[in-house]
Amino acid sequence: MPRPRPPFPAVKGLWGKPTIVNNVETLACVPYILREGAAEFASCGTEKSKGTKVFALGGKVNNVGLVEIPMGTTLRELIYDIGGGIPDGKKFKAIQTGGPSGGCLTEKDLDEPIDFDNLVARGSMMGSGGAIVMDEDNCMVDVAKFYMEFICDESCGKCSPCRIGTKRMLEILTRITEGNGTMQDLEELEELGQTVKANSLCALGQTAANPIISTLTHFRHEYLAHIQDKTCPAKVCKHLMTYAIDQDKCVGCARCAKFCPVDAIAKTDRKSTRLNSSHQVL
């Protein structure tokens, strides 16, 4: 369970002794450094971020999988040179780095070198090395909601800002994706995000709002479309979808009505049918 810090584990950790806490990827670099020397390891990478980094590249790219790249590689190189670009000629929209609590970066960030400081400065992080690419068919409000669902499930519940704050943010995102959002919801999301970030005990809560803050920063127009226009530009949020029968193509055969499980389709005359939106199954 997380606890207030300081003291940090490096000062007082296991059994009250100084303790090193690192992930497996960091520890895996130790044998190479001992064998080849620090200078050899530091010859690769950037001034402040040495060596290589393993990314789990996924999402809307042609080549998915684990890739090891030198620090300083650009996001464009990662997506297009290594990942093979976006399938089906779709347009790139965003890349989310760092795992579930990382931020979403946009086209203007593609030529920035990948290192620890650079990603943080742009509202994301290196984290566990996740890299999820999104194209024009992704709804960024739905993306933020997806990651917030995961973060809520993973919260240990010890500190109130994370336990309660993430749930409130998820409730707001759910409300927006269902067409019930208000402009005040955007203000509350930003305020809650900063509160959770500043007052949570561990890194999960401190970074939990990254998906929300970054999408609000770069894709506020999508939030506004959900709230003001009651539409999802990417056509992902099912509660904001409406269906209609193309009267120019309908011949009035009513074959479609026979297969509708809720009788949402009614025949009006010999040449047309009508769709009752109140009966639609979403």
Task: Outline where the language-model segments fall.
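Hydrophobic alpha-helical positions that pack around
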Residues: 1-71, 83
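Ferredoxin-type iron-sulfur electron-transfer modules in oxidoreductases and energy-metabolism complexes
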Residues: 1-6, 113-242, 247, 267-270
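Short glycine-rich loop/turn motifs
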Residues: 51-56, 128-130, 262
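Short flexible coil/turn linkers enriched for glycine and charged/polar residues
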Residues: 61-63, 125, 239, 250, ...
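Short amphipathic, charge-patterned alpha-helical segments
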Residues: 72-87
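Terminal amphipathic helices with adjacent charged low-complexity linkers/tails
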Residues: 86-121, 217
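Cys/His/Pro-rich metal-binding microdomains
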Residues: 157-160, 203, 251-261, 274
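Single conserved hydrophobic/aromatic residue that forms the stacking wall/gate
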Residues: 271, 275-282
